[in-house]
């Protein structure tokens, strides 16, 4: 989550650029398919939804559309409700568009340029009035955008009357699905590396955060022995911290993160650098986090909504060099949300196989 307490309105102007970009790999057939729809939406000033599974390669799908928009002088914004997602996406955008002046706007990054090419949290859109010709909204269903009418209004007021909007998410809200014409909903069921989505497995487990439990400890120790990293999701910060204090006695390279943790960005970067083997986390890492050799465990999975479970499962198997992994839903009774999440993942795998967009 982000906020803006002091800001100035950016004076709106137009300026084109060549927007050359670099890709270190060949895009998949599905990515080209999505890219064509994005360019068409920008040209026609349409609203479309990329209903794309986690790990579909949405960031790269945007590149051709970004280039098309910038070459015709469009002001563009790539927006997400979550700071963590903005940080992740902005790195990849800057690495691809090396010669572009890109404003990265969130609570720890301020405006440097004229706002022609912006990557930001939704809160930062208060800086702009009728400025953007093209807006990409990643993780449109994420908190706080999904629950905050003023942020939804900021999206509208920052855009020109005629503009293109490209929504992107693996878990679109029913209201959004009903508002967008069927032909403008682009379903993308495959990951870019053409391997199937990991399907969750259920395990009965009742957490006792006052002692080390053999089942959880054995799984975490096996992960470490197999040189795999593990995200363990909790839906309660207090429970997570109490559990951490117990397991820290046995697992030295263990840490935790949550939305109020001022060191969370540093901890996530340390995880990527191999400093930690296991990280206890809230849903702050359910979106936007990517690394190789990663598996997830969800404590009390029966208490999560379907969308969160799909997003959490989507952390696994995202890298080309490591396209598989484990997703474990620990529960005290299988919930309907758990069943629906698993069904949605299996349905997308089936559709991707039918279209020939995955190998297995």
Located regions from the model:
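Conserved interdomain linker/interface between the two RecA-like ATPase lobes of SF2 helicase motors
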Residues: 48, 182-254, 356-358
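N-terminal pre-P-loop "Q-motif" helix
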Residues: 23-46
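Conserved segment of the helicase C-terminal RecA-like domain
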Residues: 159-175, 315-344
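Cys/His-rich short segments
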Residues: 1-26
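Conserved RecA-like helicase motor core of SF1/SF2 enzymes
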Residues: 139-142, 258-261, 268, 272-325, ...
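Post-DEXD/H (motif II) to motif III coupling segment of the RecA-like Helicase ATP-binding lobe
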Residues: 130-204, 211-213, 218
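Conserved helicase ATPase core of P-loop NTP-dependent helicases/translocases
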Residues: 87, 100-114, 254-282
């Amino acid at each position: 989550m982000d906020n803006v307490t002091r800001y100035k309105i950016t004076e709106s102007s137009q300026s084109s650029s060549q927007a050359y970009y670099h890709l270190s790999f060949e895009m998949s057939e599905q990515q080209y398919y999505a890219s064509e729809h994005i360019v068409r939406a920008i040209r026609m000033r349409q609203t479309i939804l990329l209903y794309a599974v986690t790990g579909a390669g949405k960031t790269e799908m945007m590149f051709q559309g970004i280039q098309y928009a910038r070459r015709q002088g469009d002001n563009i914004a790539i927006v997400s409700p979550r700071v963590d997602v903005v940080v992740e996406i902005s790195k990849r955008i800057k690495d691809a568009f090396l010669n572009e002046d890109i404003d990265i706007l969130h609570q720890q990054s301020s405006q440097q340029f004229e706002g022609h090419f912006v990557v930001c949290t939704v809160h930062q859109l208060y800086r702009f009035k009728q400025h953007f010709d093209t807006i990409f909204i990643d993780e449109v269903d994420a908190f706080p955008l999904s629950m905050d009418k003023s942020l939804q209004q900021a999206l509208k007021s920052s855009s020109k009357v005629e503009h293109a909007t490209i929504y992107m998410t693996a878990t679109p809200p029913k209201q959004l699905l009903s508002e967008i014409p069927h032909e403008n909903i682009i379903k993308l069921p495959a990951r870019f590396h053409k391997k199937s989505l990991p399907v969750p497995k259920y395990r009965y487990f009742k957490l006792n955060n006052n002692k080390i439990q053999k089942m959880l400890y054995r799984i975490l120790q096996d992960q470490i022995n197999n040189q795999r990293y593990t995200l363990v999701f909790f839906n309660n910060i207090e429970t997570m911290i109490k559990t951490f204090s117990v397991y820290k006695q046995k697992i030295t390279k263990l840490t935790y993160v949550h939305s109020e943790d001022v060191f969370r960005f540093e901890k996530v970067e340390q995880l990527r650098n191999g400093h930690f083997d296991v990280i206890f986390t809230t849903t702050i890492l359910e979106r936007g986090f990517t690394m190789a050799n990663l598996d997830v465990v969800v404590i009390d999975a029966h208490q999560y909504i379907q969308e969160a479970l799909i997003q959490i499962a989507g952390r696994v198997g995202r890298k080309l060099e490591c396209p598989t992994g484990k997703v474990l839903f620990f529960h005290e009774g299988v919930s309907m949300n758990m069943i629906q999440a698993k069904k949605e993942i299996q349905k997308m795998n089936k559709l991707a196989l039918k279209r020939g967009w995955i190998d297995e």
